Amino acid sequence: MTVSVEATVNIFLYILMNNIAPVFILIFLGFILGKKFKLDIYSFSKIIFFIYVPALAFVKLYETKIEAEHLKALLYAVIYLAVLVTFSTLFSRLRKHSTALGGAFQNSILLYNSANFGLPLITLVFKDSPYAAFAVSLQIMVLLVQNISTNTIGLFNAGRSRLNIGESLKTILKMPAIYTIAAALLLKCVPLDLTKTFVWPAIVYLKDGMVSMALVTLGIQLSKTKFEFKHVEVYLATFARLLIGPALAFVTIYLMNIHGIMAQVLLISSSVPTAVNAALIAVELDNEKDFSSQVVMTTTLLSAVTLTVVIYLSTILFKV
């Protein structure tokens, strides 16, 4: 697949109008609500982590048919995650971050928006390609790894500043998403089509509400955030997620000898902005909330430019 200059411009405009604009509209609504009313951000956080996140994880896992050809993409997502964990840990130590900031900094790099940003983006980029369905299925593999890492590594990073290892593990085990992931995997082996039962529509309704609820909650959090435009760590985290992240992805893809459409999908997928969940986790565990919220906003805004470049480069670096 090759992308012309006109197509690149169209992709840029699409990202701006269909990904960036809707995201910021919902964030802005939450911001206005947070300024106008006295809202408890922790109540919203509890609703998201105990209802919406488990529903999203369950539906995505249950609906995804994992076949042999997807295992390489799954393996890539795990290896790339390990690379990001290693890089972000070393970078954080180099900057001599506190435990709290170090955890938030690491989450801002290794937790990326593979769901409500990455999935529609991959759908758009490959929609006119004969590999469209394959591309989306690969993205779902990445999404599964990110879902699991968010509810394990992400929670651990955010909680370790004020909790010991045992307490951090207890916090992780209290999150229902861990159990819904296990339940989804087990139910896939049972000769019962859950999508035909009366329970399924309710779960889907919750899954569909996850994105809007998360973004409005982020807006409420931002309304209570003191912005520090001189916060160097925000810009370093943004640089790491949007520029170093794709570079590390390219090296990983090259070393794993991945080519063609799969290489294009994985490079683009690994270049998306910091996940909203990074900010929500920070709110839930009261860990560097302002920093995390600012990184989500900054990376989301600037990704309209960086992603356009990555998409174009992917067609040059990995021919089909």
Say what each PLM segment does.
Residues 1-320:
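Alpha-helical transmembrane segments of multi-pass small-molecule/ion transporters
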